[in-house]
Structure formats: structure tokens, C-alpha cells
Regions:
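Short N-terminal targeting/anchoring amphipathic segment
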Residues: 26-60
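Membrane-proximal helix-turn-helix segments that form the acceptor-binding/catalytic region
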Residues: 65, 77-97
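N-terminal subdomain of nucleotide-sugar transferases
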Residues: 1-11, 33, 89
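Nucleotide-sugar donor-binding and catalytic loop/hinge architecture
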Residues: 133-149, 173-177
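Donor nucleotide-sugar binding/catalytic pocket of nucleotide-sugar-dependent glycosyltransferases
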Residues: 92-136, 144
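Conserved donor-binding/catalytic core segment of Leloir-type glycosyltransferases
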Residues: 99, 141-160, 166-169, 183
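A short, basic/aromatic alpha-helical/loop segment that forms part
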Residues: 157-162, 173, 189-192
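Nucleotide-activated donor-binding/catalytic signature segment of Leloir-type glycosyltransferases, i.e.
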Residues: 186, 195-208
Length: 208
């Protein structure tokens, strides 16, 4: 459409091709006719400096995990959640338009004092990323032995409630299919205490 665009971030993941995303400090000077699309999620100093940039501001709100989920497991998680919620409230007077990924998130913004127009736009999933051939070694190890395999993918964290998945699997294995396996595929980096609690729960249920 002829618009000049760029993607800038505070932290850039290693999986992205070089040059696609640039560091926020390299953002050029903006003008009042520019538009900033700001992805609001966790606590960051950018929440308190966004107002200093010229141009209209569109905020995409992609949920902030309530800090109470991390109580007893991660002090960092608690502080990040609290700071994120404070930043979300601080930005309420600096948004010209908002997109929330769910009705729940829209209500969160309204409760935090946002008075601009807020629409809901669910997360668009690039299904092409999942069009991959399965790993042969894993398939040969777990396929064809008569077991039902149940897979959950996602970060191991209290807000994901993996204990509920384990509880569900326990009932499934006990009542319906003894020859079954549960895979929880995800990193527990920073959530080691929660991971240990899950291990204890598995032992308590005598699951293997």
C-alpha cells in the first residue's frame, strides 16, 4: 500500500532472520502523522515512555498473566505481572485505539480506564508452521505399540494449570484406557519449583 513500516523490539528472539526486527533504540524520529502499533503484554519500561513518541497510538493487548498465579513459584513472575498491570493502566490515557485478543482482555482494558474504541481480534495462527513431517525417531519409539498418546504443548507454568491436565489424564487412564501416555512438551525455565510440584503430584497419583 506504499506505507513505510518497521518492526522494533526491546528483546529479539534468536529464531528470527537477521534484520527483520530492529532494536527499539534504533527507531527513527517519529512525526504526528505516523502510527505506532504497540504490542502490550508484560511489564517493560516502554509502557512508560510510549507517550513520548509522536503519532497516533494503537495498542494490541495480548493478556497479562495475573501475578497471583506465580505466588510461591517465581518472584520474578509476580513482579513482571504486577508491573505489566500497572503499565497497562498507565497507558489508558495514551491510546487512540485498541485491539484485544479476547472479550476478556477487552473488559480488562475497560476496567483499567481505557475510553478509546476497543475491538476484539483473535490471534491469527499461521497453520503453515505446523505443516511439518513428524520426527521419525519419535514416531518409531511411541507409535504402533497400542498406546494412546496425549500431547500438551506449552510452557510449563502455574497459569497453564498442568496439574489439571495430569488429573484428567489420571482419570482417563484409570477409567477408560490403561495403555495411555501423557506428554507435557514445554520449557519450565524459571518455573522449577512448579515443575517439582508437578513431579510430586505425579508420584502421589502413582502415575508412571
Amino acid at each position: 500500500l506504499g506505507y513505510g513500516t518497521g518492526i522494533y523490539a526491546e528483546n529479539i528472539g534468536p529464531g528470527l532472520p537477521p534484520g527483520i526486527v530492529r532494536q527499539i533504540h534504533s527507531l527513527p524520529r517519529l512525526h504526528k502523522q505516523d502510527v505506532i502499533i504497540y504490542h502490550l503484554s508484560t511489564g517493560t519500561a516502554l509502557n512508560y515512555t510510549l507517550e513520548n513518541y509522536k503519532g497516533r497510538k494503537i495498542i494490541i493487548y495480548h493478556n497479562i498473566t495475573p501475578p497471583e498465579f506465580f505466588e510461591g513459584y517465581s518472584r520474578h513472575g509476580v513482579e513482571m505481572g504486577k508491573d505489566g498491570l500497572r503499565g497497562m493502566a498507565y497507558l489508558s490515557d495514551h491510546a487512540d485505539y485498541c485491539l484485544a485478543v479476547s472479550e476478556f482482555n477487552k473488559k480488562q482494558l475497560q476496567k483499567a480506564g481505557y475510553t478509546c474504541r476497543i475491538d476484539v481480534l483473535p490471534i491469527l495462527i499461521p497453520f503453515r508452521d505446523y505443516e511439518k513431517k513428524p520426527d521419525r525417531k519419535i514416531m518409531s519409539r511411541y507409535a504402533g505399540d497400542g498406546y494412546i498418546n496425549i500431547l500438551f504443548t506449552g510452557r510449563i507454568a502455574p497459569n497453564k494449570k498442568q496439574e489439571d491436565i495430569i488429573r484428567m489424564f489420571y482419570q482417563y487412564q484409570k477409567r477408560y484406557c490403561a495403555k495411555s501416555r501423557l506428554f507435557l512438551a514445554g520449557s519450565y525455565d524459571g518455573m522449577e519449583a512448579y515443575y517439582e510440584r508437578l513431579q510430586e503430584y505425579v508420584q502421589k497419583l502413582h502415575l508412571k
